[in-house]
Amino acid sequence: MAQSTKGAALVLSWQRCGDDSHWCSFLSVNLDDGSLAKGGDYVIWAEDADGSRKETVYVGQGKPVSNCLARHRDEVAITRHQRSGRVLRVTWAEVKKEHRGGVEHFLAQALQPLEGDRWSDDDPIQVNLPW
């Protein structure tokens, strides 16, 4: 598990896809990927096709992350953000169980997702943001 502390922050290894390390497509990322079988925190966002104008759609945590993402693929509140000229992206990081709630809380505060209104009550744990 690639987690270290840098000052007071927890440093996470945010996952990317492909040999060129591009941001993963939320709707087509391979949910059988081994890194998604672990527990962690994740961020779903919408952006223009050229990667500009990122808007965080949802942050969450769970184990396995693949099950969480599969469930979100069926939620119109999330998928509706992929529309003309906009694409949905996802990244995730393996996070120890005892830190997941705090990381989720921090991500929700920092990224202000458009969807979701219930996040962990754990004290926020500062982490490096994906972008």
Feature locations, PLM:
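GIY-YIG nuclease catalytic motif and its immediate N-terminal context
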Residues: M1-K63, R71, E98-Q109, L129-W131
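Coupling/hinge elements of helicase-like and P-loop NTPase modules
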Residues: P113-P130
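A broadly used, surface-exposed interaction patch
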Residues: S66-R89
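Short, intrinsically disordered/low-complexity patches at protein termini
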Residues: V76-A77, H81, W92-E94, P124-V127
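Nucleic-acid nuclease catalytic cores
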Residues: R86-R100
